[in-house]
Amino acid sequence: MKDRVVLAYSGGLDTTVAISWIAKERNAEVIAVSIDLGQGGEDMETVRQRALGAGAVESIVVDARDEFANDYCLPTIKANGLYMKEYPLVSAISRPLIVKHMAEAAKEHNGTAVAHGCTGKGNDQVRFEVGFANTAPELEIIAPARDYAWTRDKAIAFAEENNIPIEQSKSSPFSIDQNVWGRAVETGYLEDLWNAPTKDVYAYTEDPALGQAPDEVIISFESGVPVAIDGRKVTVLEAIEELNRRAGAQGVGRLDMVEDRLVGIKSREIYEAPGAMTLIRAHEAMEAVTIERELARYKRGIDAEWSDLVYDGLWFSPLKRSLDAFIEESQEHVTGDIRLVLHAGNIIINGRRSDHSLYDFNLATYDEGDSFDQSLAKGFVELHGLSSKIAAKRDMGIL
């Protein structure tokens, strides 16, 4: 009986070629697994049939849109997940979900190995392989693009020699990864840092300079979960999808950054994440109203560590699980409404209300009704600066 290899199948050039290559070079049966993460584009049945046409003995499509939104995007919202304070982890949070379903498929179909199409330069090889080490360590891992130094030209030549049906051509300029949480674009002329992105780079967002009328939105949260938009109840997936449309129409969520990859190189990335950025900014604003100062300060460090761990492929790590527990506890009172305006590429917060608010109008006001006892301030200031004052006297030789 032949070995069975479960392949993470995107429908693109590299993984389509990988089906035939694995079958031929490893004398194995290939089971292609494609995960619907709300990426849009091609119909998933078309993707499934392409895998079969390339030689897969089985081609499985998993509709994981709600699972992705609830179990991966939502924790990112609660953690204000932004790698290097910018990137909302578009690809990084999708990989552990793909790993989960591949491991399940390998178990169900008696797979002996798993395969991916990642190169040796990227982060995804780490995310996949560390993920498998944590969920299915008994499986062999095959990475033909990395281990056999495939290039796009080599992949196309192999496809032509073996009559593999592919739609990509040598003129395809970009590498693109997308899901409902966002879209990542790299390579091509973008590798020259001085080249500005042209309009064909973007698909999820309109040009911010188009002059659309501002769009005012009210996002309601319950314990950190977005539950309504403009008073209409929504699921997490529906919230992301609606804000992708509305924020995307305003050019919100475009990012152009030079990113520090896990493997040690810098990479220029273009991201579009209109729904993700809107939800994260709204969530940050809700936390600012409802989380106590010391907890908020500490959580900012936890959020940054959480984002780094997820980016680095450590979704299944003990530290990540512990941080999840801390973050979940911090969300108890993150409930209320945030009003914001989407316009010309900007997210402008202009209203906040919550029954759990720590904002006390009578303490904050400078007008009539001020209840703040200012007589307490002098002693507070003296004590707050006392240790610094003593150190300064020592340094000046007057202690």
From Swiss-Prot:
Pathway listed: Amino-acid biosynthesis; L-arginine biosynthesis; L-arginine from L-ornithine and carbamoyl phosphate: step 2/3
Listed InterPro entries: Arginosuc_syn_C, Arginosuc_syn_N, Arginosuc_synth, Arginosuc_synth_CS, Arginosuc_synth_type_1_subfam, AS_cat/multimer_dom_body, Rossmann-like_a/b/a_fold
The protein's Enzyme Commission number: 6.3.4.5
Binding site for L-citrulline: Y87, N123, R127, S175, E259, Y271
Enzyme class: ligase
UniProt KW Oxidoreductase keyword: no
Keyword list, A-Z: Amino-acid biosynthesis, Arginine biosynthesis, ATP-binding, Cytoplasm, Ligase, Nucleotide-binding
Superkingdom, taxonomy of origin: Bacteria
Listed GO CC annotations: cytoplasm
GO BP term, pick one: argininosuccinate metabolic process
Compartments (UniProt record): Cytoplasm
Binding site for ATP: A8, Y9, S10, G11, G12, L13, D14, T15, T16, G117
Disulfide bonds: none
Catalytic activity: L-citrulline + L-aspartate + ATP = 2-(N(omega)-L-arginino)succinate + AMP + diphosphate + H(+)
A matching Pfam family: Arginosuc_synth
Residues holding L-aspartate: T119, N123, D124
GO molecular function per UniProt: argininosuccinate synthase activity; ATP binding
Gene3D superfamilies reported for this sequence: Argininosuccinate synthetase, chain A, domain 2, HUPs, Single helix bin
Stored PANTHER family: ARGININOSUCCINATE SYNTHASE
Family stated for the protein in its record: Belongs to the argininosuccinate synthase family. Type 1 subfamily.
Subunit structure of this chain's protein: Homotetramer.
Protein name: Argininosuccinate synthase
Protein's gene: argG
